[in-house]
């Protein structure tokens, strides 16, 4: 037996079978750094149509988590796909660097500002800490393969950014959107500051739920309201509340003029309840012997005076539109300094706005009985006092959704304080914002309704904070009238100039006289700006000013929580400062959860860190998982899910390796064969690749990365692995090295690789780089500078063997494979090359298959394939799952060719080559080798 190994075209490539990504990727990153790849991309695509994806700034505090990784990877995929489409698509990373979380970290080390450390030094430490965190996060983002202008990121602590925030504020004031107000705002006692809507989280909380008796002072007036002559017992208005601590601030009881109210006799006193709530309220009190005396409307009750349950204070009953009979008692306890509706009612009726609670959550000195106590701890004492005063009708507990601080996770309170607001009503900002939302494209589509609902219902935006580490609110107000200085706009521009030179310290360390001369009449505001104003200003501070970018951005892409966060604050800043929305399109992705749909937490032990993933599996696995997951809903990740992703990656890598290994010796300059002269199956492969490329580009354009990933996987595993590559192995390995059949397949493979590597590049950035390095090509450009491959061709409309024809052949082949498997299991054959396949076909299928002539066997990977009319079928034939088709498999008895392994009667016909078939002899001995037309 001879050794024919040297006569075969064995696969050969520098592209390794094993990814070894965790070790290779850092080396590839290093190469990109040395090449200055991002700069080269910018230079190469300069002058092209721009596509700007504006990066929402992550907070510079702590290592990135998998949610951060998902966000940056999705952005990177989109940017790279747009670059492939020929756009100049820059990516400038941003970071949010002011605010409470950084303050807290610095406090842990240095103590509170103004106590253990000066405020000036505290700010310096905050800036130092933020910069350090940026470098940590930057390193992680770069390790993920994310390309961007990492050397010139936008940080909200950059002096020019801080200055441009002040200039943005000046525009907002100039446009008439700023107002000062004494209003209830969400207040965190731990922060010692007001919070914006976006900083409020809702979580379940168990609270006391009490019904309190307010004694009616004028019984005769109450009797008259109910149409009675008189009342012979005391009467009480009953309110229900889950915040007993607000009772010291009670100034009124609210009813609704349109609701009906009942007077109910219980033993020796009367109570007032909304008519529709009587039954459920009495049931809650476990009272069965109550008697409804009379009913009246709310408007008859207004003006009646009650007595505070534990203070010597008169409490009027007033009408409030916000009062309903859905729950509680239908009478609402009103503390104007601790609720929005309460405050509105208080202003309308000139109720006392006395402050009873300080910023630290303790009652002020003027709070009788409870001065100095922490409000939430005082609940029990207040309930106890109500009991002693016989003013407690009922006491219970309730579990309900309650606002908490996004950072401290502690319950918030509503507290009226003097603050600065961007008014939603002045200059029609709310209506303008709602119109801008309609003019923006939202995906998923429900995002539009979500943000519309939030903007419709949101209060004025409180932009002032009582913090140390933040951009100042550098205003001057009159010491008596508290009106803004008449030259506020000019002053703000002067402040901005100084900050641009020396940072925010230029304001905090300056004397008022550096900015104004009327220091006797005006004082400076000591507040800082809400950190959401920092990030919300990015469209004005970056897009509107950086000539490398453009306003509005083409795309904002963030997590779905940003409808109430950055999407909204960006919109409000842009609309109030510039009068137009900052984005054309807004996409959101879901949160990352574990495989059971649970939020990730250290306590559950289900945290998957991006660092662990890229240090073990490689960043490309994380990128592939991100792209493969439909990010419009929650994104599940776990070790098991990543293992499945790694399996998918291996299939893709193996496909790429097979393709590359069969391009050994191929010169694209001299060896390319024209489409019309290719073997028909190779024509199909190119046309099929073109069909997939069109779908893939469309999916990329719609940001449907999971569709892209599915298409690439299907292409590699089904169209290539299970069909085309399976069939051409024989031709590639055994045909004449320089013969037409092999060069035809290599031409197709060349086109396929050039398309496939580009499809992969936005997602599998490191692997695509490897593939590109191992690919024969006619360009020196790195893959990052390439555009979509244009060397593919579709079939002409009149092509006889078009995609539809080959799809039918694939169906028939699948049925043959099914029957082959049956015969393998029956031990009739061990491999398909041992099989003689006979297909019995009706007229339609016969006509399809006869076009392939004697090359049908190559498509079926058998040594012999016969086509016969269905009427000749035998009892041993098996019906296919295709009408008009039967298949018969028998074992072929002819000898095996030691070179191609086909069974052939021609083995030994040539005395010089006794153990190979005539086809192999032809491929070894003749100049042209065998010929192929179809497969």
Swiss-Prot record:
Q: Which reaction does it catalyse?
A: tRNA(Ile) + L-isoleucine + ATP = L-isoleucyl-tRNA(Ile) + AMP + diphosphate
Q: Which keywords label this protein?
A: Aminoacyl-tRNA synthetase, ATP-binding, Cytoplasm, Ligase, Metal-binding, Nucleotide-binding, Protein biosynthesis, Zinc
Task: Show the InterPro entries listed in the entry.
Answer: aa-tRNA-synth_I_CS (IPR001412), aa-tRNA-synth_Ia (IPR002300), Anticodon_Ile_BEm (IPR033708), Ile-tRNA-ligase (IPR002301), Ile-tRNA-ligase_type1 (IPR023585), Ile-tRNA_ligase (IPR050081), M/V/L/I-tRNA-synth_anticd-bd (IPR013155), Rossmann-like_a/b/a_fold (IPR014729)
- Indicate whether Lyase appears among the record's keywords: no
Family assignment from sequence similarity:
Belongs to the class-I aminoacyl-tRNA synthetase family. IleS type 1 subfamily.
What is said about the domains? IleRS has two distinct active sites: one for aminoacylation and one for editing. The misactivated valine is translocated from the active site to the editing site, which sterically excludes the correctly activated isoleucine. The single editing site contains two valyl binding pockets, one specific for each substrate (Val-AMP or Val-tRNA(Ile)).
Tell me where in or outside the cell this protein is found.
Answer: Cytoplasm
The role this protein plays is: Catalyzes the attachment of isoleucine to tRNA(Ile). As IleRS can inadvertently accommodate and process structurally similar amino acids such as valine, to avoid such errors it has two additional distinct tRNA(Ile)-dependent editing activities. One activity is designated as 'pretransfer' editing and involves the hydrolysis of activated Val-AMP. The other activity is designated 'posttransfer' editing and involves deacylation of mischarged Val-tRNA(Ile).
Residues that coordinate or bind Zn(2+) = 897, 900, 917, 920
Official protein name in the record = Isoleucine--tRNA ligase
Cofactor binding: number and manner: Binds 1 zinc ion per subunit.
Single GO biological process annotation from the record: isoleucyl-tRNA aminoacylation
Known partners and oligomeric status: Monomer.
Q: Which species is the source of this protein?
A: Francisella tularensis subsp. tularensis (strain WY96-3418)
Question: Motif location ('KMSKS' region)?
Answer: 599-603
Q: Which Pfam families match?
A: Anticodon_1, tRNA-synt_1, zf-FPG_IleRS
Cellular component terms per the entry's GO annotation? cytosol
One example of the protein's molecular function in GO is: zinc ion binding
Which residues are noted in the entry as ATP-binding?
A: 602
EC id:
6.1.1.5
């Amino acid at each position: 037996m001879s050794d024919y190994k040297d006569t075969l075209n064995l696969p050969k490539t520098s592209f390794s079978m094993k990814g070894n990504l965790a070790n290779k990727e850092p080396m590839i990153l290093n190469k990109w750094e040395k090449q200055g790849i991002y700069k080269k991309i910018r230079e190469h695509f300069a002058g092209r149509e721009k596509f700007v994806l504006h990066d929402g700034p992550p907070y510079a505090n702590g290592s990135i988590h998998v949610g951060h990784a998902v966000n940056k990877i999705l952005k990177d995929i989109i940017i790279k796909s747009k670059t492939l489409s020929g756009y100049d698509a820059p990516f400038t990373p941003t970071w949010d660097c002011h605010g409470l979380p950084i303050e807290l970290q610095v406090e842990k080390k240095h103590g509170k500002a103004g106590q253990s450390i000066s405020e000036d030094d505290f700010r310096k430490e905050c800036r130092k800490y933020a910069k350090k965190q940026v470098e940590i996060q930057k390193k992680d983002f770069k390790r993920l393969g994310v390309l961007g202008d990492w050397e010139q990121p936008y940080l909200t602590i950059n002096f020019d950014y801080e200055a441009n925030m002040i200039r943005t504020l000046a525009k907002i004031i100039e446009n008439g959107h700023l107002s000062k107000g004494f209003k209830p705002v969400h207040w965190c006692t731990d922060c010692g500051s007001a919070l914006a809507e976006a900083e409020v989280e809702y979580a379940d909380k168990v609270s006391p739920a009490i019904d309190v008796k307010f004694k009616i002072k004028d019984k005769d007036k109450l009797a008259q309201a109910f149409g009675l002559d008189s009342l012979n017992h005391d009467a009480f208005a009953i309110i229900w509340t889950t915040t007993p601590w607000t009772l010291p601030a009670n100034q009124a009881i609210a009813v609704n003029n349109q609701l009906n109210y009942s007077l109910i006799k219980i033993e020796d006193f009367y109570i007032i309840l909304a008519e529709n709530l009587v039954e459920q309220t009495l049931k809650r009190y476990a009272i069965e012997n109550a008697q409804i005396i009379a009913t009246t409307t709310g408007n008859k009750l207004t003006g009646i005076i009650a007595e505070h349950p534990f203070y010597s204070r008169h409490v009027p009953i007033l009408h409030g539109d916000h009062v309903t009979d859905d729950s509680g008692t239908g009478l609402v306890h009103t503390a104007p300094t601790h609720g929005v509706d309460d405050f509105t009612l208080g202003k309308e009726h000139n109720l006392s706005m006395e402050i009873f609670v300080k910023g630290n959550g303790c009652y002020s000195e003027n709070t009788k009985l409870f001065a100095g106590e922490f409000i939430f701890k005082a609940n029990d004492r207040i309930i106890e006092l109500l009991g002693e005063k016989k003013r407690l009708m009922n006491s219970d507990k309730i579990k309900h959704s309650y606002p908490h601080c996004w950072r401290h996770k502690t319950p918030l309170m509503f507290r009226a304080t003097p603050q600065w607001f961007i008014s939603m009503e002045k200059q029609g900002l709310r209506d303008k914002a709602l119109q801008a939302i309609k003019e923006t494209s939202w995906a998923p589509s429900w995002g539009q309704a979500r943000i519309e609902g939030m903007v419709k219902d949101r209060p004025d935006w409180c932009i002032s904070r009582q913090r140390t580490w933040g951009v100042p609110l550098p205003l001057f107000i009159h010491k008596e009238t508290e009106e803004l200085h008449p030259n506020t706009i000019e002053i703000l521009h002067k402040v901005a100039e100084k900050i641009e030179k020396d940072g925010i310290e230029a304001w905090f360390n300056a004397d008022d006289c550096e900015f104004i001369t009327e220091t006797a009449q005006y004082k400076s505001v000591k507040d800082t700006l809400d950190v959401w104003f920092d990030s919300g200003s990015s469209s004005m501070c970056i897009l509107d000013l950086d000539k490398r970018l453009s306003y509005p951005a083409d795309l904002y892409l963030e997590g779905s929580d940003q409808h109430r966060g950055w999407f909204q604050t960006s919109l409000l800043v842009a609309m109030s400062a510039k009068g137009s929305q900052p984005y054309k399109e807004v996409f959101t992705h879901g949160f990352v959860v574990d495989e059971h749909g649970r939020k990730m937490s250290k306590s559950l032990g289900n945290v998957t860190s991006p660092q662990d993933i890229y240090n073990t599996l490689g960043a490309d696995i994380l990128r592939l998982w991100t792209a493969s997951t439909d990010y419009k809903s929650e994104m599940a990740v776990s070790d098991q899910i990543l293992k499945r992703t790694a399996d998918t990656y291996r299939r893709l890598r193996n496909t790429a390796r097979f393709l590359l290994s069969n391009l050994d010796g191929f010169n694209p300059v001299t060896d390319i064969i024209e489409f019309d002269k290719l073997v028909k199956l190779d024509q199909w492969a190119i046309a099929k690749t073109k069909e997939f490329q069109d779908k893939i580009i469309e999916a990329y354009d719609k940001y449907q990365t999971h569709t892209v990933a599915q298409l690439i996987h299907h292409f590699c595993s089904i169209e290539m692995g299970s069909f085309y590559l399976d069939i051409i192995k024989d031709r590639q390995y055994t045909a004449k090295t320089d013969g037409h059949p092999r060069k035809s397949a290599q031409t197709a493979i060349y086109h396929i690789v050039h398309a496939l590597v580009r499809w992969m590049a936005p997602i599998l950035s490191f692997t695509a780089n490897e593939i590109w390095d191992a690919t024969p090509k006619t360009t020196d450009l790195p893959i990052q500078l390439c555009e979509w491959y244009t060397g593919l061709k579709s079939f002409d409309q009149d092509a006889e063997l078009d995609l539809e024809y080959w799809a039918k052949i694939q169906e028939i082949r699948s049925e043959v494979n099914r029957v082959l498997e049956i015969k393998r299991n029956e031990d009739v054959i061990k491999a398909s090359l041992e099989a003689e396949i006979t297909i019995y076909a009706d007229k339609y299928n016969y006509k399809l298959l006869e076009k392939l002539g004697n090359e049908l066997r190559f498509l079926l990977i058998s040594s012999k394939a016969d086509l016969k009319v269905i009427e000749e079928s035998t009892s041993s034939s098996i019906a296919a799952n295709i009408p008009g088709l039967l298949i018969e498999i028998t074992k072929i008895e002819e000898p095996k060719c030691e070179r191609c392994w086909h069974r052939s009667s021609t083995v030994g016909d040539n005395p010089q080559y006794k153990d190979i078939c005539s086809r192999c002899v032809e491929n070894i001995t003749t100049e042209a080798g065998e010929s192929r037309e179809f497969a």
